[in-house]
Swiss-Prot record:
It comes from the Eukaryota. This is Modulator of macroautophagy TMEM150B-A. Residues 23-50, 105-115, 172-183 are extracellular. Keywords: Autophagy, Cell membrane, Cytoplasmic vesicle, Endosome, Glycoprotein, Membrane, Transmembrane, Transmembrane helix. One of its GO terms (biological process) is autophagy. It is a multi-pass membrane protein. It is found in: Cell membrane; Endosome membrane; Cytoplasmic vesicle, Autophagosome membrane. Glycans are attached at residues 29, 33. PANTHER family: FASTING-INDUCIBLE INTEGRAL MEMBRANE PROTEIN TM6P1-RELATED, MODULATOR OF MACROAUTOPHAGY TMEM150B. GO terms for cellular component: autophagosome membrane; endosome membrane; plasma membrane.
Amino acid sequence: MWAWALLPICLTIWATAGIWIVYGMSVSNGSVNLSDGFPYISLCGTDPPQSCVFGQVLNVGAMLGVWISAIRFQQIRDYNCHSVLNSVSLAMGILCALGTSIVGNFQQSNQLETHLAGAFLAFVIGNIYFWMQTALTYMVKPTHGGCYIGPIRFCLSVACTALIVLMAVFLKMNMKSISAICEWIVAMILFLLYGLFAVDFWHLDGHYFHVKKRTVIPNEMQVSTVTLSI
């Protein structure tokens, strides 16, 4: 059912529009002074009222991220790919979403250490998640999106990794404005990578999760023998 493809598209549009709205609010009310350089995303969402919008945008985005990660995990399993990489990838996707929520709820002006921990989960773990998804793209058959989706994911993951490294390097060199630009580009790439799941979800007929009671395997059943004297 093609409607499932709207889920990752909604996340991409929601998150992209949301953080740029926060940027616009922070600039318009003077919370951010562009003459001091281009601001980090978190700096734009530090002060109210935009901090409220920032938190809501990231919380909804995190919820959608968990949902998408779970559906993608099950979709890969349904293609008879029971690789450990798929399970680890699900964990990475959930951690990325958790970090995103932490970033939105713990502003850097209030809880800097917690905020930075959330940013690490959102950016670094999120990047690792999409590296795993790139690998799974080549492992799973059929491959939706033809021969293009794999290279596109690979190139975007490479760009994301390079920009995260550059972001840290420029920050170390006290070139905060360039570092902030790298951060914004990384965020846009991650949103785009989530949006690419629309290619895979287009082919979903539906999804459901259920809990099964573990059944005892016959070979694992304990056999009791009693010797009777005759």
